[in-house]
Regions:
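A transmembrane-helix-recognition feature enriched in membrane-embedded lipid enzymes
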Residues: 1-6, 19-43, 229-233
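A short, well-structured juxtamembrane/interface segment
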Residues: 3, 38-68, 76
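Non-catalytic C-terminal accessory region of glycerolipid acyltransferases
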Residues: 10-12, 16-24, 59-64, 87-88, ...
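General small-molecule cofactor/ligand-binding pocket signal
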Residues: 51, 119, 197
């Protein structure tokens, strides 16, 4: 499958198969835990977080007083990240409205019940996000969603990937620092470990392609911590510069 190929292109076929098996198991966990996260109280969900690594990066970024962008890839329990941090920070989360409009009200309720403001990825939503950052608030963004229109190609695990430029623009205009974070799912239902990784200044480089490459390097750094927990079923590489589709003939 493509997940195994991009992660283990220099490893043996047996190692690729082992990873692919783990990916399928973790994908199933992602689907089943989403319903749990959506239906349990935020206070109950908070107790599932048993460890935070990199808290000092979060604290140092907040101490700058210029707002903060938390980039959380589709890795581990990304729904839990929003619930957990909305109770601690003035969080505004960007989202892409679902194709099935009947689900939008449900998703908005689920994600705002902890206190976050959910903003659609529209011009009005982006303006509101920028204002929130200038007021010292926190913006939550999924950095690995393929942009529908704007964006540039940048390498991700050695494969070209259409990558957003929104995060870099928000950081450039507002001066807000950027950190990456995700909730790693621990084995045997032992809870979740949150990781924070600081992004360097290149994440807001004025050159869109350099900024996008820096963004994808940070996504890679997160994924390498828990590679099987990445949402490889999201066809991140389906748009290529030469128009080909690398997923043809792939099981995922």
């Amino acid at each position: 499958g493509l997940p195994a190929v991009v992660l283990l292109r220099h490893q043996s076929e047996a190692e690729r198969r082992r990873l692919l098996r783990k990916v399928l198991i973790e994908t199933g966990k992602t689907a089943t835990e989403a319903a749990y996260i959506w239906t349990r109280s935020p206070a109950r969900l908070e107790r599932l977080v048993v460890e935070i690594r990199g808290q000092e990066h979060l604290d140092a970024s907040l101490a700058q007083g210029r707002g903060l962008i938390i980039a959380s890839p589709h890795l581990g329990a990304w729904e839990l990240m929003g619930v957990y941090w909305a109770r601690r920070l003035r969080l505004h989360s960007m989202y892409r409205p679902p194709r099935q409009q009947e689900y939008e009200a449900l998703l908005t309720w689920v994600r705002e019940r902890s206190g976050a403001e959910l903003l659609p990825a529209t011009p009005a939503g982006i303006r509101r996000m920028y204002r929130a950052l200038t007021e010292g608030h926190v913006a939550g963004i999924l950095p690995d969603q393929e942009p529908p229109e704007a964006g540039v190609f940048a390498p991700l695990f050695g494969q070209p990937a259409k990558t957003m430029t929104l995060l870099a623009k928000l950081s450039q205009r507002s001066g807000a620092p950027v950190i990456f974070g995700f909730a790693e799912r621990l084995p045997w239902a032992r809870g979740y470990r949150i990781h924070f990784l600081p992004a360097g200044p290149e994440i807001a480089d004025p050159d869109p392609e350099r900024a996008a490459a820096a963004l994808n390097r940070m996504v890679e750094a997160c994924v390498q911590i828990a590679p099987a927990q990445y949402q490889w079923t999201y066809r991140r590489f389906r748009r290529q510069p030469d128009g080909r589709n690398p997923y043809h003939g792939q099981p995922l």
